[in-house]
């Protein structure tokens, strides 16, 4: 989340144009899109097409402008390398990018011919709205095992995607507009890759899940998808401000607040000055613009209000989280162990007058490091019970299913993290079940991965993930219904919020 969010960032790839091929085939390496032909790669299991432009380069006059149409090309465009990462700073030792020309997507399909159109799954990556890239995620398992077309998309981040300024059309919502441009590309081109434009599932994790919340609330997204999956991005997510005891702040920001924040940025009095700034200089204020804005044409109202009042696209929706979301962030906020004697003071800093009730409900466990208790408290308060609220409120208007990824021994996918009492099923850990991230899974974890891939695919085809429990626990040897609200003490949290 925000500046402390962790994302494994992709290396920047180059794109070239190659000579035209003799013909284009729906199940071969060359496919004709609405703007020109692309040549990808074919393996025994999948076809992959990388760096396909879905909007014009957002540079020069197009910086801080809604995505513009791509100019058609002649010949066959090379699509054998993944999309480059959008401009972003280095986070936790991961590489930065200064690539502003980044509005590309990647397509993965099964290699074999199909006589019927396939469901399409469009992935929106996470990274706190300031980091991440489509090319981080290899969806080969999802595509091949589910006979699906999987599209991973880039969108502008941070100061390039969510900047605002008085008089600037689209202030604070350019990244969301990019996601919609990618979804419109899918509507126009799904069939060329064997996909069914009438059966598109949009799914994402963390900031990607929050993006799905925004698209559910955006009138401009009408008809662009038929199903939605929100992974660890509950629409009403709030986190401690760490400035005022008891104050929690949400993700979404009004357009007026975003424009106020953008006024005078880098000493510029107008947009012409800002558009002339090099990428590297703009990246010095990158993390200041990590909140999508409502009161905009793309997002007219706060998604929290939209979900509560039913002003959403009423499509089948799957909403879930991991059992130990906050363990990923706790060592970033608190790098050193916290003596249990200081537990009460830390809770007072976070919860103000409610700290005593929280401490009584969540006692220390005797390991003389209170960070794991704090992580559990914030997992329940900020992530789990907010996910439960998202399910309940969306469920008044559309069909909603739930899951919780709960493997306590899942491998760590983020390199270089400091020691912590128990990471458990940390934020982002379920990604290992869906994508090939280069980690080795045990046979039992592989079985969970196979189950998750199959049920995500079932949901993409039918809108039904295949279980009847309100919340399905996903863990080795323990796949089945769980009393989620009781486990995460959501009754307690609703009583004090």
Label for each model-derived stretch:
Residues 1-24:
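Secretory targeting and sorting signals
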Residues 25-172, 442-455, 460-467, 492-495:
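Non-catalytic accessory segments of hydrolases
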Residues 91-93, 188, 222, 231-346, ...:
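Substrate-access "cap/lid" subdomains that shape
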Residues 98, 384-497:
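Mobile gating loops/cap/lid regions near enzyme active sites that modulate substrate access
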Residues 102, 171-191, 254-260:
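Alpha/beta-hydrolase active-site loop
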Residues 126, 174-178, 206-209:
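Active-site loop->helix "elbow" adjoining a glycine-rich segment at hydrolase catalytic centers
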Residues 193-206:
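Alpha/beta-hydrolase fold nucleophile elbow
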Residues 209-221:
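Short glycine-enriched nucleophile-adjacent loop
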